[in-house]
Amino acid sequence: MVRTSFQKVLETITRKALPCFLTSTILLMVLPVFAADKQKDEDTLRQANLVLQGLLNSKSISPTLLAKANCVLILPGVKKFGFGVGGSGGRGPLLCRSGQDFKGKWSAPAMYSVGGASVGLQVGGSSSDFVLLLMNSKVVNQVLNGKTKMGTDATAAAGPGATAASASDADIFTYGRAKGVFAGVSLGGATVEPDNDANYRLYSKTLTATDIVRGTDTKPSEEGKALVTVLNSKIGKQSK
């Protein structure tokens, strides 16, 4: 069962049977932090929407490849770690098509985190945007069920350009934006995993990534709805 940091704090308070005044003090300290972090989650969704629209409006990716994607992971503003610390880190929403064969409308967003040295090598300046296309049900199930290392648990490749005659059979295609232009980049060695704390904040209950993107009654926030609307209007359903 998924247990978030916020739930662990509440469990600690309950288990230790702390005095009321101390419990109140702890909650007064924790709740504002929880609210601030939730606002950051909403900001991430809003920024992801802008990144997605930037990719969709660019001529850097084949519409056919987009139409074949089972899921999309959008990572806005991935930041490079400071001097002496290898790699980079960031987070963003994963959205998947509905239906057993991943050909339906797009799901509510589940928040994910990403990290690894290979990401840091691709980050231009202080931060960069990335979009990952998950191309088959095998890699989708891998990503939904826990931490996935690209290149080890799933094959990953730089996304082909819009004029490419064909694409490889990689599980994941990756695009990065540098200086306003999207291009295929390699993120082999990077890891992605569900951000359970962020998902708890966004949905106000404990949900796994699978619950969110494969569920039928998950209700996203307004920022999440806006992201779903863009995907459904720009890409829509896959052809059978």
What are these regions (language model features)?
Residues 17-30:
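Bacterial N-terminal signal peptides
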Residues 16-17, 77:
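Hydrophobic alpha-helical segments, especially transmembrane helices
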Residues 36-240:
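Small-residue-enriched, tightly packed secondary-structure blocks
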Residues 1-15:
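N-terminal secretory signal peptides that target proteins for export/translocation
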